From Swiss-Prot:
Gene name per UniProt: PQBP1
Record keyword Repeat present: yes
Protein name: Polyglutamine-binding protein 1
One GO term describing the cellular component: cytoplasm
Stretches the record annotates as 5 X 7 AA approximate tandem repeats of D-R-[SG]-H-D-K-S: 104-138
Main location: nucleus
Domain comment in the entry: The WW domain may play a role as a transcriptional activator directly or via association with the transcription machinery. The WW domain mediates interaction with WBP11, ATN1, SF3B1 and the C-terminal domain of the RNA polymerase II large subunit. Except for the WW domain, the protein is intrinsically disordered.
Length: 265
């Protein structure tokens, strides 16, 4: 197996390898890579305008004319008055596809806008529904409050009515018992005698022989906040200058007790 040429060269420089094997020659096969469909000879013979070339279309086997600057094509020569210069079918398909794609994107964008608008409308409708439910709830609460107040008022009226009935029944029962006692008494009581008895005075009452007011059963009894001085507090007139006077400490204690009682009341 022959050594590579590079290794042979390094070994030869070091003096290890004395004989260099010749590098094998490669066979070069010439191929025609010229697949340019432009017919330069026909272009020169027809005298086409600048930038115009006659090109062979391998798909249909017919020639057409092509402008290299504008990339426009025509089936007829540019010198022919019936020639129509347009874009190639490939360009037209590409532009149409781009236009359709752009149109689809615009439609999609419009649909998204409509969807967004619909969602906003739905959100607004939900807000209205929520507001309506809130109003309905407030109305129900208000009606419930009114019903509760009405029930409480009706209950109070019934309680007052029952209380009035009870009071009337008690008064009626009391009056019946009074009449029954009068009927069961051994002799009828005269109201005039009762009033005359009330008008009579006790001979021992000071009001029967002096200007003193008529007393009651509690007149003359010691009061709770009254100082115990031993003096006659019922005396009036000339007897007002009586002895002994209460002590200053008793007066202060009585005043303090009276003010305390007034504050509690």
């Amino acid at each position: 197996m022959p050594l590579p040429v590079a290794l042979q060269t390094r070994l030869a420089k070091r003096g290890i390898l004395k004989h260099l094997e010749p590098e094998p020659e490669e066979e070069i096969i010439a191929e025609d890579y010229d697949d340019d469909p432009v017919d330069y000879e026909a272009t020169r013979l027809e005298g086409l305008p600048p930038s115009w070339y006659k090109v062979f279309d391998p798909s249909c086997g017919l020639p057409y004319y092509w402008n290299a600057d504008t990339d426009l094509v025509s089936w007829l020569s540019p010198h022919d008055p019936n020639s129509v210069v347009t874009k190639s079918a490939k360009k037209l398909r590409s532009s149409n596809a781009d236009a359709e794609e752009k149109l689809d994107r615009s439609h999609d964008k419009s649909d998204r806008g409509h969807d967004k608008s619909d969602r906003s409308h739905e959100k607004l409708d939900r807000g209205h529904d929520k507001s309506d439910r809130g109003h309905d709830k407030s109305d129900r609460d208000r009606e419930r409050g009114y019903d509760k107040v009405d029930r409480e008022r009706e209950r109070d009226r019934e309680r007052d009515r029952d209380r009035g009935y009870d009071k009337a029944d008690r008064e009626e029962g009391k009056e019946r018992r009074h009449h029954r006692r009068e009927e069961l008494a051994p002799y009828p009581k005269s109201k005039k005698a009762v009033s005359r008895k009330d008008e009579e005075l006790d001979p021992m009452d000071p009001s029967s022989y002096s200007d003193a007011p008529r007393g009651t059963w509690s007149t003359g009894l010691p009061k709770r906040n009254e100082a115990k001085t031993g003096a006659d507090t019922t005396a009036a007139g000339p007897l007002f200058q009586q002895r002994p006077y209460p002590s200053p400490g008793a007066v202060l204690r009585a005043n303090a007790e009276a003010s305390r009682t007034k504050q509690q009341d």
